[in-house]
Curated annotation (Swiss-Prot):
Binds directly to 23S rRNA. The L1 stalk is quite mobile in the ribosome, and is involved in E site tRNA release. It comes from the Bacteria. NCBIfam families: rplA_bact. SUPFAM superfamilies: Ribosomal protein L1 (SSF56808). Belongs to the universal ribosomal protein uL1 family. It comes from Mannheimia succiniciproducens (strain KCTC 0769BP / MBEL55E). GO terms for molecular function: rRNA binding; structural constituent of ribosome; tRNA binding. GO terms for biological process: regulation of translation; translation. Pfam families: Ribosomal_L1. This is Large ribosomal subunit protein uL1. Transmembrane segments: none annotated. Keywords: Repressor, Ribonucleoprotein, Ribosomal protein, RNA-binding, rRNA-binding, Translation regulation, tRNA-binding. Disulfide bonds: none annotated. The gene is rplA. Part of the 50S ribosomal subunit.
């Protein structure tokens, strides 16, 4: 087992793993230990009251955080005609059809999000083995297959996060940067949780949001008292 660094020992000593912190206190703890030489991301893990083995209880979707994520996002769009012009005007970094597909087949993957209009899926479908494993395959459930590509581009650029539970029924995503104010991070977390509640499967019973923890890229997890949200 790898030895803990002095920094990680200090972080672990400063976080009470048995306690659920009030949100402002939780954020203060994160900021206290966010001492890396870069602006660390603030990530969230949400334990859901679902049975991930049942397909009708899996949760997947996307929402735009009111204060963004602090990340610069490059967007590729598969579309044509007037939609291509609209996508470019909305800020898309790459727009095309077969030409864009050829770039991707050659390994040119300089983007973070892929959006497609429905008529372009015949082209995108050929890229499943490349885009799928990277979590980049467009999907209507998260709004990346849409006739309104311009709005999808704007959402991606303005702080949209996509979420999907893992095999343990936990959602992992980001809600901003350590440099964000406590208010901005709280608003982003509230927006994410509201989106998750709306996405609750009808077959899920009992408490839906069971636990919420936040952490920075290089820090320990801090449990959040949901009553403080």
């Amino acid at each position: 087992m790898a030895k803990l660094t002095k920094r990680m020992k200090a972080i672990k000593a400063g976080v009470d793993s048995t306690k659920a912190y009030e949100i402002n206190e939780a954020i203060a703890v994160l900021k206290q230990f966010a001492t890396a030489k870069f602006d660390e991301s603030v990530d969230v893990a949400v334990n859901l009251g679902i049975d991930p083995r049942k397909s009708d209880q899996n949760v997947r979707g996307a929402t735009v955080l009111p204060n963004g994520t602090g990340r610069s996002v490059r967007v590729a769009v598969f579309t044509q005609g007037a939609n291509a012009d609209a996508a470019k005007e909305a800020g898309a970094d790459l727009v095309g059809m077969e030409d864009l597909a050829e770039q991707i087949k050659k390994g040119e993957m300089n983007f973070d999000v892929v959006i497609a209009s429905p008529d372009a899926m015949r082209v995108v479908g050929q890229l499943g083995q490349v885009l799928g494993p990277r979590g980049l395959m467009p999907n209507p459930k998260v709004g990346t297959v849409t006739p309104n590509v311009a709005d999808a581009v704007k959402n991606a650029k303005s702080g949209q996060v996509r979420y999907r539970n893992d095999k343990n029924g936990i959602i992992h995503t980001t809600i901003g940067k350590a440099s964000f104010s406590a208010e901005a991070l709280t608003q982003n977390l509230q927006a994410l949780l509201a989106a998750l509640v709306k996405a609750k499967p009808t077959t899920a019973k009992g408490i839906f949001i069971k636990k919420v923890s936040i952490s920075t890229t290089m820090g320990a997890g801090v449990a959040v008292d949901q009553n403080s949200l």
